[in-house]
Design a protein with these regions (language model features):
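Internal helix-loop-helix
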Residues: 49-117, 159-165, 284, 291, ...
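Glycine-rich phosphate/cofactor-binding loops in nucleotide/flavin-utilizing enzymes
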Residues: 2, 70, 74-75, 93, ...
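Glycine-rich beta->alpha junctions and the first turn(s) of the following alpha-helix
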Residues: 2-7, 11, 194-288, 358
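Short, charged, amphipathic alpha-helical segments
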Residues: 274-279, 305-313
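A short, Trp-centered hydrophobic/proline-enriched beta-strand micro-motif
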Residues: 117-125, 169
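A short core secondary-structure module
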Residues: 147, 151-197
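Glycine-rich phosphate/pyrophosphate-binding beta-alpha loops
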Residues: 155-160, 202-203, 357-362
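A structural signal for short hydrophobic beta-strand segments in well-ordered beta-sheet cores
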Residues: 139-142
């Protein structure tokens, strides 16, 4: 069976590839390499909103273009290929979850601002002592009239230092089983009692934080969905997040960088260079087909748990292997005293370190494999 984009999708892909290639200046790229959520990043997101591109995958009723999931994947892939950081948590996970579970008041307030690129969310799930066992969270929210009083701590909150709001998982019924009694609150980061400290990751960038909640008063109308039934929202949001963690464009961008360098240095006939580039191109194609498969299924039903996890596992593990292999190629054949080679080697080093997070961001791959086995293959859950 031959699978390919139709004519209109190919035209969209070409338009987006051109758009993202010229979206950022060299200085803006250099800044966002280290400061992933700073003022330059926010300006770029506003630029995308002003140009009307943030709504590619959103329904028209919420201000979007009304395109389907395949077009949304094209948008994400082309941004990844150009190494343009999207407001992915806000645009691709919180936004769609609000569309399904939010109140009319929440939708009318948050969704237009997201599409304009003016409002940013961070996800407050992980906690210091609970590892990947999200359901064991201990951040609590106690009802006090028209407010919830929130106390606790989260860790590895991506963009927490620059977010306008935190999509926060809290325990609202401490006596319920651990997967129950959880709720989702939207916390305004300007509220008294909210604070953060930076976590600098191995790529040298500041894009995650520890966030703290000390008697933060959250209005009750910032409860998303039904109180004590937040686990459903968490799984919906995480399924969207896992899909976005495996775009084929990330591999395509890697190929473009190294191929251009190898061609300029007359290395395309070197056996190890050709082998590495062929593997990279083939992996991009497989990843792209997997993206399309998930997108096609999503057109008629919610994101499948097993499909979302499979996309995340494949994309995150293959990209790490490819970066390792291509770093060896550049190191073997390149001269770091040459500016072009030094620039490529530095870029590969930063990206390789940054991609390490992909195997546990959005849920560690060991758990993703169990989700694939149980939900996709009907196998029994591993005893605990």
């Amino acid at each position: 069976m031959f699978v390919a984009l139709n004519a209109s999708q190919q035209a969209l892909q070409e338009e987006l590839r051109t758009y993202f290639a010229q979206l950022m200046t060299a200085d803006e790229r250099a800044t966002t390499t280290i400061d992933r959520h700073g003022t330059v990043y926010r300006e770029i997101v506003r630029r995308m909103g002003h140009d009307g591109w943030l709504g590619v995958g959103w329904p028209k009723e919420f201000g979007g273009h009304g395109f389907g999931p395949i077009e949304q994947h094209i948008f994400v892939n082309e941004a990844a290929r150009a190494d343009v950081q999207l407001p992915s948590v806000t645009l691709q996970t919180v936004g769609p979850t609000l569309q399904t579970f939010g109140t009319d008041e929440q939708k009318s307030f948050f969704l237009p601002k997201i599409l304009c690129g003016e409002l940013h969310f961070a996800i407050g799930y992980s906690e210091p002592d609970n590892g990947t066992d999200l359901a064991s969270l201990r951040t609590i929210a106690v009802r006090d009239g028209d407010y919830f009083i929130v106390n606790g701590q989260k860790t590895f909150t991506t963009g927490g230092h620059s977010a306008d709001y935190i999509w926060l998982a809290v325990r609202t019924d401490p006596d319920a089983p651990k997967h129950k009694g959880i709720s989702i609150l939207i916390v305004d980061t300007r509220d008294p009692g909210f604070s953060w400290t930076p976590i600098i990751t191995c790529d040298g960038a500041h894009h995650v934080d520890a966030t703290y909640y000390s008697d933060v008063r959250v209005p009750a109308n910032m409860l998303v969905g039904v109180e004590n039934q937040g686990w459903r929202l968490i799984t919906a949001q995480l399924n969207h997040e896992r899909v976005m963690l495996g775009p084929s464009g990330r591999i395509g961008g890697l190929y473009d960088h190294v191929y251009t360098w190898a061609a300029a240095h007359d290395l395309l006939d070197a056996t190890d260079v050709r082998s590495a580039l062929i593997e990279t191109r083939a992996t991009e194609g497989i990843n792209e087909l997997l993206n399309w498969q998930v997108a096609a299924a999503e057109s008629s039903a919610p994101v499948d748990v097993a499909d979302a996890s499979a996309t995340k596992v494949f994309g995150s593990e293959r990209i790490q292997r490819l970066y390792e292999r291509l770093e060896e190629v550049v190191g073997r054949h390149g001269d770091l005293a040459e500016p072009v080679t030094a620039e490529l080697a530095a870029w590969l080093n930063i990206q390789a370190k940054r991609n390490l997070v992909l195997t546990f961001g959005g849920g560690v791959n060991e758990i993703q494999r169990e989700l694939i086995a149980v939900n996709g293959l009907g196998l029994p859950r591993v005893p605990r």
